Amino acid sequence: MKKQNIRVGDKVFILAGNDKGKEGKVLSLTEDKVVVEGVNVRIKNIKRSQQNPKGKRISIEAPIHISNVRLTIAGEPAKLSVKVTEQGRELWQRRPDGTSQLYRLVRGKKG
């Protein structure tokens, strides 16, 4: 499995789809899909029941593929790469203009 640089709670930028150009917070994450707050909103119809005698329509965020989002740092979409230090720690590294800047540790790696 490829290492993912996106975690729940991160701010992301939408690269493709109907909501292209929007930003939002990651609500949930699976292996290849993310649910972003306020993005890819779908309307779901709830049938009539004893609790809802008239029925209702609710808005939910549908998942989008992880390749269609990019992590934002300081309000700009950022590409991250993995760097292995001399101690064997793996770090996410940001390269906005050719320079390297530490972003955070790769999840699950201790050192």
Swiss-Prot record:
The keyword Ribosomal protein is assigned to this record: yes
Superkingdom as given in the UniProt entry: Bacteria
Gene3D superfamilies: 2.30.30.30
Signal peptide bounds: none
Matching InterPro entries: KOW, Rib_uL2_dom2, Ribosomal_uL24, Ribosomal_uL24_CS, Ribosomal_uL24_KOW, Translation_prot_SH3-like_sf
Molecular function GO terms recorded: rRNA binding; structural constituent of ribosome
Biological process, per Gene Ontology: translation
UniProt keyword list: Ribonucleoprotein, Ribosomal protein, RNA-binding, rRNA-binding
Keyword flag rRNA-binding: yes
One CC-aspect GO term: ribosome
Quaternary structure note: Part of the 50S ribosomal subunit.
Functional description taken from the UniProt entry: One of two assembly initiator proteins, it binds directly to the 5'-end of the 23S rRNA, where it nucleates assembly of the 50S subunit.
Family, per entry: Belongs to the universal ribosomal protein uL24 family.
Protein name from the UniProt record: Large ribosomal subunit protein uL24
Organism: Chlamydia pneumoniae
